[in-house]
Structures are given as structure tokens and as C-alpha cells.
Amino acid sequence: LLDEIMSYVEDHLAGHITLDDTARQFHVSASTVSQLFRKRMGVSYYRFVTQRRLIAAKTLIKEGTALDTVAESVGFSDYSGFYRAFKQEYGISPTRFKTL
């Protein structure tokens, strides 16, 4: 089940995916999904989603995609939220990462 959920998340990164929506998709409770991630992945569902979005963002940045387009393409509702998450995760800004 966890592998299927992880694949679902990967396929829907650009959209607004929530724990409840994901649980409904797999006909389980939100707490079941949450427990699976905590026990098997060592992170929360939302942390996993954010990490996957940021990994996808790094790829797009290195491909030369405009940063505001990157943020939208990986499911962030605005650039400032993307910027904060990226900087918190990697310790550098997306702009700085682009120059590396």
C-alpha cells in the first residue's frame, strides 16, 4: 500500500494533494496513511510530499525552468512558500542553487 501511495503522490505533485484526499483514493483512513509514513518512512505524509516536490523542483531548476514556473509546476501555491521550503530544506535559495 505504501508503494502505491508514494507513486500516487509522485504522479500528483503539481496538484493540491491532501492526506484526506490520498486516504480516500486508497479507501483507508487518514490515520492509516499517516501511520504508514511515520513507521516505514520516518517522516510525516506532508513532509514526504514536500520533500518530493523539492526534489522535482531541483531537477526543473537545473533544466533551466523559470523559478516561478518551477514553484507552480511542483505544487506550491506561491513562490514565497516555495522559496521558504527550498531554503529550509537545502540551506540555500533557489536562485543560488540555479547558479551552482
Predicted regions: what is each one?
Residues 1-3:
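Short helix-coil-helix linker/hinge
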Residues 7, 11, 16-20, 39-77, ...:
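Terminal helix-turn-helix DNA-binding modules in bacterial transcription factors
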Residues 29-30, 77-78:
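Short coil turns linking two alpha-helices in DNA-binding domains
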Residues 33, 37, 81-82, 86:
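Short hydrophobic/aromatic patch on the recognition helix
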Residues 84-100:
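…primarily DNA-binding HTH/wHTH and HhH modules…
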